[in-house]
């Protein structure tokens, strides 16, 4: 028999409480994410919170890569240890109670996360092969605006502007300002 919790506020409360309770049982705390909480509460009718594990091999990725992959692609809640370090555990919200207490659901979500994080690792490793400075010329191939030119053209305008503006800021370094402007759009050429 299907179960439904009609009130979205009740679903949010249950998700919040259950994530916190399960995290605390492992000495962890959830990463506060009101937007994700609202989104997930709108996706499920009967929230059942389960915990899954992140393979240790992926814990060397930057925390931002892990949390972005979990949050945006999978709708998982990140957990941290008491020191604030990202834990190799995530919370997933299922839409049903199962006879195996969610074991198959957790296993499936861990498998999907492994695939997502493998992709993320590939792009991260590829991106690290070239410095941001080595990517600036690739901005020439990216159109910023038909009337304003490429992203490279845009960066050149930003460099000139940064240098000029730095003159009006006490102790500002115009060379550093130009360098920051030169690199500020280079990430647009990365896989991440």
Label every model-predicted segment.
Residues 1-192:
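Amphipathic alpha-helical "coupling" segments that flank catalytic cores
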